[in-house]
From Swiss-Prot:
This is Matrix protein. It comes from Human metapneumovirus (strain CAN97-83) (HMPV). Residues 110-183 are annotated as: Nuclear targeting and binding to host importin KPNB1. The gene is M. One of its GO terms (molecular function) is structural constituent of virion. The lineage of its organism: Viruses, Riboviria, Orthornavirae, Negarnaviricota, Haploviricotina. The keyword Membrane applies. Residues 1-110 are annotated as: Interaction with M2-1.
């Protein structure tokens, strides 16, 4: 079993984001990825990660109003595991690599292949951008963050677009507002990091946010969900080799 620690916050308590790569113990084993609901931990990350290696997990492929899901049951040994969520559901669209190998409504025991632990700031200091492109009231534009990374292994640039929020702006003022937002963002954003959770996430740490970012609060870590952005086997490599170079902001008319 492999294990990886992505450390974005050094302190206790911290918010733990745990993701696990699994293979079903089945005649036609499917590969899948599940992630636990965020939880707050007081155990040193190295100890928590070590106890996560004792995980036993079963999954059940099911349906819901929002689409296919995986129902997850988990157990593990160790005192730190008392705070670990034991029953939860995850989006099957992100979790599953191979739909054709899954049996509907069948409880399946899984073998844990890889455990990822990402540490973030404590509750109250972690926020999330909701990645929704649905119309919101009379909003006219979407604020998009273009996060630039460098793949240090291949020495190639990678840009990830992330939806931030919807805003109301007159078309004649959009260029001026976009410039102002860019200036505010330069002061607000200090760093971004890729981490394995819900497929893949980007963690942006805010510092002295102003204007459109001021509600986020100084020092807040913001999660941007990227979903099934890459194949599961590439996640650990990306977390190690992608370096944040900078973030640009653009306004896109709805």
């Amino acid at each position: 079993m492999e294990s990886y620690l992505v450390d974005t916050y050094q302190g206790i308590p911290y918010t733990a984001a745990v993701q696990v790569d699994l293979v079903e113990k089945d005649l036609l084993p499917a590969s899948l990825t599940i992630w636990f609901p965020l939880f707050q931990a007081n155990t040193p990350p190295a100890v928590l990660l070590d106890q996560l290696k004792t995980l036993t997990i079963t999954t059940l492929y099911a349906a819901s109003q929002s689409g296919p899901i995986l129902k997850v049951n988990a157990s593990a040994q160790g005192a730190a595991m008392s705070v670990l969520p034991k029953k939860f559901e995850v989006n099957a669209t992100v979790a599953l690599d191979e739909y054709s190998k899954l049996e509907f409504d069948k409880l399946t025991v899984c073998e844990v292949k890889t455990v990822y632990l990402t540490t973030m700031k404590p509750y109250g200091m972690v926020s999330k951008f909701v990645s929704s492109a649905k119309p919101v009231g009379k909003k006219t534009h979407d604020l998009i963050a273009l996060c630039d990374f460098m793949d240090l292994e291949k020495n190639t640039p990678v840009t990830i677009p992330a939806f931030i929020k919807s805003v109301s702006i007159k078309e004649s003022e959009s260029a001026t507002v976009e410039a102002a937002i860019s200036s505010e963002a330069d002061q607000a954003l200090t760093q971004a990091k890729i981490a394995p959770y819900a497929g893949l996430i980007m963690i942006m740490t805010m510092n002295n946010p102003k204007g459109i970012f001021k509600k986020l609060g100084a020092g807040t870590q913001v999660i941007v969900e990227l979903g099934a952005y890459v194949q599961a086997e590439s996640i650990s490599k990306i977390c190690k080799t992608w370096s944040h170079q900078g973030t640009r902001y653009v306004l896109k008319s709805r």
